[in-house]
Amino acid sequence: MVEQGVFTIVEVSTGSEYSLSDSITIEPVVVPHRAELSDMHAFIVRGPTRSLLFLPDHDRWDETLNHYHAPNIRSWLASMNVDIALVDGTFWSADELVGRTQHEVPHPPVSETLERLGCRKQNDPEIVFIHMNHTNPLHDVNSEEHSEVTALGWRVGEQGMTFTL
């Protein structure tokens, strides 16, 4: 597809901003993640009126927050000035990893993220859990876990969601 001109390979640098159009920019944000074949980045997408963090995968909140010297998730998101954060929701808990451990497949469980966040506050960004494994009970809109997320003021990603930036 690269040879056909469908994709263009562009090397990006952390902390640099890249224009996609006159009104849309992206900024790569390095996040700690098992370095199997390359480094790992989240992306901030900034539009004319709002911005979105795309963080589908990282290892552990402690590692990510320590990397940015942030005391908690809220302060880290505030430092990036994002309105919406699409965050790693791979597993609800480590119990979903049959035959493997969270050390082997590190993702912060949604249950841990909720413990760290608690209820959504007035100036918090909208947080949406994405990148869910097939074992994650958040897929079931009638599950207790799904209800817990929404009762705290956060959201569970759905196929076809759109965000106006």
Report the location of each language-model feature.
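Active-site HxH/HxHxD metal-binding segment of metal-dependent hydrolases
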Residues: 1-4
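Active-site regions of enzymes building and remodeling cell-envelope glycoconjugates
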Residues: 6-9, 26, 151-156
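Core dinuclear metal-dependent hydrolase active-site scaffold
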Residues: 9-78, 160-165
